[in-house]
Design a protein with these regions (language model features):
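Sec-dependent signal peptide hydrophobic core
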Residues: 12-20
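N-terminal secretory signal peptides that target proteins for export/translocation
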Residues: 1-11
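Alpha-helical segments in soluble extracytoplasmic regions
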Residues: 32-90, 120-137
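Secreted/processed peptides and extracellular or luminal domains of membrane proteins
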Residues: 100, 113, 122, 137-138
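N-terminal signal peptide c-region/cleavage motif recognized by signal peptidases
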Residues: 24-27
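Long, amphipathic, charge-rich alpha-helical segments that form helical bundles/coiled-coils
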Residues: 75-114
Length: 138
C-alpha cells in the first residue's frame, strides 16, 4: 500500500488549482489591443453624447450619475484611469475626451460650478475631433 502516490495528486491539485485559476483570471483581464482604443472611445462617446444632449435639454442630472458609472466601466476595461495600460499614452486626445465629456456636459447645466473652466468645452471639442480623425485612420 503506497499512500504517498495517492496523496501526491491531491496535494499537487491543491497547489496547482489556485495557480491555474490565477492564470485564467489574468488572461480574462488581458489588455485590449491599444490600436483599437480610438475606435472604441468614439463608439462609446457616439452612444453617450446624444444621450447627454437629451439630458441637458431636459436638465436631467440623473443621467450624469448613471453615465459616470458607464464611463468608469469603459475606462477600467481599457485600463487608462488606473494607468494599467501605458500603450494608451499615445492617445491622450481620446482618453481626455472620454474623461472630460461628463464635466463638459454638467457645465452646460451648472454654469457656476468651479470645475467649469472657460476653455474646457473648446479643449473637449478639439480632443473629440482629433480622436475621431485618429479612429478613422486606424
Amino acid at each position: 500500500m503506497d499512500l504517498s502516490r495517492t496523496r501526491l495528486p491531491a496535494s499537487l491539485g491543491r497547489i496547482v488549482a489556485p495557480l491555474l485559476l490565477a492564470v485564467a483570471a489574468s488572461g480574462a483581464l488581458a489588455q485590449q489591443d491599444a490600436d483599437r482604443f480610438p475606435a472604441a472611445a468614439m463608439s462609446f462617446l457616439g452612444g453617450e453624447l446624444p444621450a447627454m444632449e437629451a439630458a441637458i435639454a431636459a436638465r436631467d442630472r440623473d443621467y450624469f450619475e448613471n453615465a459616470m458609472g458607464r464611463m468608469l466601466d469603459f475606462s477600467d476595461s481599457w485600463g487608462f484611469k488606473t494607468r494599467d495600460n501605458p500603450a494608451l499614452a499615445r492617445f491622450p486626445m481620446c482618453t481626455d475626451a472620454v474623461s472630460d465629456f461628463l464635466v463638459v456636459g454638467m457645465c452646460r447645466i451648472m454654469t457656476t460650478n468651479a470645475a467649469c473652466e472657460p476653455g474646457m468645452s473648446a479643449r473637449f471639442n478639439s480632443n473629440l475631433q482629433q480622436c475621431r480623425a485618429l479612429a478613422a485612420k486606424l
